Amino acid sequence: MKKIITLLAVVAFVVSCSQSRKWTDKEREEVRKTLRDYRDRSAIRHMEAANYGNLEQCVLTTIEGTYPDYNKYDQLTAKEDTLNAAMVSCVGFSIGDNFENLPLLFPAAELQQAGILPAGATDEQIQAFYTCLAGKVKELYVTPQQFTVAL
């Protein structure tokens, strides 16, 4: 009887520990807030909301997958470095192997407001600009991740 009670106590302890390893919505929101702060001061601030939402989810999923126990992530001394590494990985992935998704980082409307693209540019002209930009970026950076780090 004593062994059964001890066994039940151990099982209850293990189950309670495994349940506490999952991230709560509050913990996810804390990481999202950090990502939003990062977005405000980085080159990805021009991403459209839907694309940024996908990037945010990728980063959160990457970190949560690497650190299923939020407390271990929260206690990291290099927590910001971990976040930056996940960000670089996800942005590099979202740019694409041929830098075909540069418009996600640099939307044409933002480039027109900044005076980089003329306001009346046609779709063909905008596509030609992105093709040229992708070519120049490929000349300077071998991989999308290298380009992302440079941003």
Role assignments for model-derived ranges:
Residues K2-L7:
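Sec-dependent signal peptide recognition
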Residues Q19-L151:
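Mature extracellular/luminal domains of secreted and GPI-anchored eukaryotic proteins, especially small
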Residues V14-S16:
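C-terminal motif of bacterial Sec signal peptides marking the signal peptidase cleavage site
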